[in-house]
Amino acid sequence: MVVGPVPVLARAVGVLLVLAGLVAAAAAFPTYLVVGGTEVSPVTGVADALVALVAPVATLAVGVGLLLGRVPRLGLGYAAVAGSLAVGRLLIELYQGHGSTVRPAVEVLAGERVITSSVEISAGWVLGVVALSLTVLAAVVALVAWGRTVMEDGGALDPLRPALAGAAAVLGVGAVLCLALPAADVPDRVVTDPATGLETVVTQEGPQALLERPGLALLGGLLLAGALLLCAVIAPSLRPRLGAVGGLLGVAVFLLAAALTGLRDAARSADVEWTVPGAGLLVVGLGFAGLTLLAWRWRAQRVPSVGA
């Protein structure tokens, strides 16, 4: 592995990632929104805190490594992917905080089934928006710094790249399909007629799917789905090998955080259940984590040169 001088821009990306991680971690603890008079807070216990800190801790760790100048293209690849995915999420957050009352609907926020008849933003929402904005800015700077950062290897991952790209593309399609539907939903209710004993299944309104929301949320959902698929396809082609590791890690962290958030929501409330798409999101997240580990650990067999 050959690593040249780390440019200032690359270290600046590290600073932005560290700030984004710290702000995102802080955003998990105060009240997120007040929806219909109900205070919504992501963290109410230790398990909630562990789930909420998955992505911030990963971002913070990568940012510190990049700030110190260690394997810079790994950090730049992570920043580029995380920031690309943050654009759509930022638009969805802006809709949740300001536009969701235009068309009131049922939502599941932090395990709470609420109706967006009125929404008041709180510190958690503001900090979350700041963290996403910092992540987007880190991605922009990372794209500029990528070409100025010298980091090369012997091409050990090259024989595996086609298979890695194919597997990532398949998992990316699966991730988009799972992400399009709620990871935690309101189950149907069975009503029994006391006179006849006849059971009737009553469908309860649940949270809207990713592409069912209007305005900024719809645009954000489209951008998120497109960015997820694009990042899944491009990440294995990043060079050197550790650049691909950083890109795949960014996708894996996002998917695992989203899947665990859905599982947390279902565990916190008896009115909400974990869905098949939510379980699928966890599976594809683990799949990307496996690809990340494979790229990290891969060592191609070297053919000894003649006369060596």
How would you label these PLM feature ranges?
Residues 2-308:
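Compact integral membrane and secretory-pathway proteins
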